[in-house]
UniProtKB/Swiss-Prot annotation:
Name of the protein described by the UniProt record: Inactive metallocarboxypeptidase ECM14
Domain (Peptidase M14) ranges: 211-537
Lineage of origin: Eukaryota, Fungi, Dikarya, Ascomycota, Pezizomycotina
PROSITE patterns: PEPTIDASE_M14 (PS52035)
Top-rank taxon: Eukaryota
Location(s) in or outside the cell: Vacuole; Secreted
Cofactor(s) the protein requires to work: Zn(2+)
Amino acid sequence: MHVTVQLSLLLSLASSLPLVSAIPQHDGQAYTFPSTGRSATADTDPVLEVRQGAYRPPSAWTRLRDSIVESVWGVPQRGKDSETKTGKQSEAASKAPATLQARYGEDVVLRFTIKTQEEMKALVEASNILFLDVWGTHDDGIPSLLGLLPPSLQTSHVPLIRDLAQAIYESYPKNNPSSPSHPGATTRRFSPSASTPESQPHETKNIFFQDYQPLSVLLPWMRLLVSMFSSHTTLISVGTTAEGRDIPALRVGVHPTNNAQQAPRRRTIVISGGAHAREWISVSTVSYIAYSFITGYGKSRSITKLLEQFDYVFIPTVNPDGYVYTFSTDRLWRKNRQSTSLSFCPGIDLDRSWGFEWDGNATRSNPCSESYAGEGPFEAIEAREIADWARKEVTENNVHFAGFVDLHSYSQQILYPYGHSCAHLPANLENLEELGAGLAKAIRRSSREIYDTKAACRGIVASGAREKGTNEPVASYALESTAGSALDWFYHDLDVRFSYQIKLRDRGSYGFLLPREHIVPTGKEIYHAVVAMGKFLVSPHILEEEVDEPHAGEQTQDNSYDEDGDNLFRAQGGDPQVRFTRRNIGAHDDDSE
């Protein structure tokens, strides 16, 4: 049977300069697309309720946008009746404040099914012209059913959100955050007493992970951890942001007594998040793993052994300025807050600004682009500061970086180098694939969630066809460049042989607006992956020992562990235990890549 690949693009049709937005709607929910008046999930064409806030006459920008999209995709013009009914029905539903309605009220999120390279090129071109934001892609192998369907279904687009402003409103912390959804609220402060069982008898032990936390809460929480666990935890700064904030990090490790004049070369693993400001789940996940390691020392045999072998540097957000901005102004902001050549388009993409294989030519003339890489390598201040810190650790502090994990969202992928080109192969490709598969298995055993493992260059590429016999892609469509990434720089320039970028939950149902209920489950599954990585770097045989549960929340739902967590690397159904065999890794050789 011939198999094709279904490619879905998530993008925001924004009515102003670049807004980022995307959440797929749940199955069975119908939405009336503003340009057509048609329901995307119904068999007929009823006019259904549209939850977009109060109806506003379309602006000139909106009319221009719609006409271009209609010309590209052949969408029929909507009639007056459908527009009137849509407006009337959209008045009542949204509970989002006026500030969010004003910013996001006209935005819609669509999923397009791409079948040809020409359609892909047309959509990418239209997205660039209209400053639309592509959230991501996903591909599924399906039978060649499209040829049996009428053209209207073959070219249909599926709305993925009915009320973006409401979805953003619901994503903010419940307890009086300093956000545009609570314009009168003051900045929250972290209160240690608020997290005790006595004051919150019906909550889990650590209330910190029951919601997304702003920087004003995150920093005091980090200081509190250091004061409580000073024997193996220190608070450091790995740089300064464009707006003058420190980039805080927690260094966790147990240093044995050494009488030598020079300390032994210390192996270090870096876990970072928050490079893209809107990806809140990455900030919470780094914090969760840090808390689990800090509180697990002396209680968990796995954690105790790892902290005796490695220093872990946890950087919850490498983009504090952007993170603060997502709480105060724009929930879907992606870049940092650095000034550019256009005063009304600030910000540089921190994961496109690193020095290795930097390629900003595609966005050099457009600072408004969400992927703007700056005028040159390391123009983004935060990327330059972290790179300088890492180099100094190697040259002055006798540090050897053994691993690097950069957390992002979303799509549930474990990506290894290289991102800039699939033609450039890493020297230890087999080892990267082997450990990547082990991380995915650790996640699957802890939560039953599936994470795909692939090269970073294929994380944003979709294929339209497969070669017979080899199942290799015949044609690939790159949605955006991933040159200049932290992943590639740490691997190549800093020689961190085990570098990964992990894209966290989910696969598109919520996108960047992942509900707070996913914070603890996501943290737990990535905690298990980080533990597995540490054990692999120590010795493959250590993977056979226990992996204890983290100490940062309630127990996992599937209860698939014994008391010591021995089952981490056992396949379901009693299959033999998975064993890693790390092969010899030769010296770094650019010619072999």
